[in-house]
From Swiss-Prot:
Residues 47-68 are annotated as: Disordered. Expressed by the venom gland. It comes from Hoplocephalus stephensii. This is Venom nerve growth factor 1. The keyword DNA-binding does not apply. GO terms for cellular component: axon; dendrite; extracellular space; synaptic vesicle. Belongs to the NGF-beta family.
Length: 243
């Protein structure tokens, strides 16, 4: 009997010793911990990939300034708009480079090259000699190339947006306007030069005319008649005290 009890006790102890240990007591670096670390790394990597893909699908919103600049630069003009000659005006120029002196090669304020200016003035004097050196203009005018016109009044009296840059065939052109205005409303103390100040009041004023220009209509480019300065004239008013 004692032998049987002794045998059962030994078998019980051997069974306890041979039983597998709990995962809670597994030391660091054991296979169970390695599998858990690999699983965590895999989940983290998948999370990073998912986050990266989400960022690519939903990019960060751009600034308002960038959006406005991009929308203005992405407006493409149909080349067919320039095929009809009736839309062309001698005072409107589309060019990738600064415009020339002027239509008749007279002095304008746009130029920075003094030598080129002097050459063109001399050429004009040779082509159109002045026989009477006493000739003077009634009003003094100045002609300029306007390079940054953004607003103008159309033929209906509405304020419209003028296109400064025109994207044509993947090349950016600038829209230039050749404008003429009065340098001074009173070139002489009495008003216009050469008038009889005893009987007339006079002054110089800038007049406008309509030219076709590319303007914005929603997200499309369209031709419109707009007003620009084109001349300087003398206005005379009869003095009433002579009647």
């Amino acid at each position: 009997m004692s032998m049987l009890c002794y045998t059962l006790i030994i078998a019980f102890l051997i069974g306890i010793w041979a039983a597998p240990k709990s995962e809670d007591n597994v030391p660091l670096g054991s296979p169970a911990t390695s599998d858990l670390s690999d699983t965590s790394c895999a989940q983290t990597h998948e999370g990073l990939k998912t986050s990266r893909n989400t960022d690519q699908r939903h990019p960060a919103p751009k600034k308002a300034e960038d959006q406005e600049l991009g929308s203005a630069a992405n407006i493409i003009v149909n080349p067919k708009l320039f095929q009809k000659r009736r839309f062309q005006s001698p005072r409107v120029l589309f060019s990738t480079q600064p415009p020339p002196l002027s239509r008749d090669e007279q002095s304008v304020e746009f130029l920075d090259n003094e030598d080129a200016l002097n050459r063109n003035i001399r050429a004009k004097r040779e082509n159109h000699p002045v026989h009477n050196r006493g000739e003077h203009s009634v009003c003094d005018s100045i002609s300029v190339w306007v390079t940054n016109k953004t607003k103008a009044t159309d033929i209906k009296g509405n304020m419209v947006t003028v296109m400064v840059d025109v994207n044509l065939n993947n090349e950016v052109y600038k829209q230039y306007f050749f404008e003429t205005k009065c340098r001074n409303p009173n070139p002489v103390p009495s008003g216009c030069r050469g008038t009889d100040s005893r009987h007339w009041n006079s002054y110089c004023t800038t007049t406008q005319t309509f030219v076709r220009a590319l303007t914005m209509e929603g997200n499309r480019a369209s031709w419109r008649f707009i007003r620009i300065d084109t001349a300087c004239v003398c206005v005379i008013i009869r003095k009433t005290d002579n009647f």
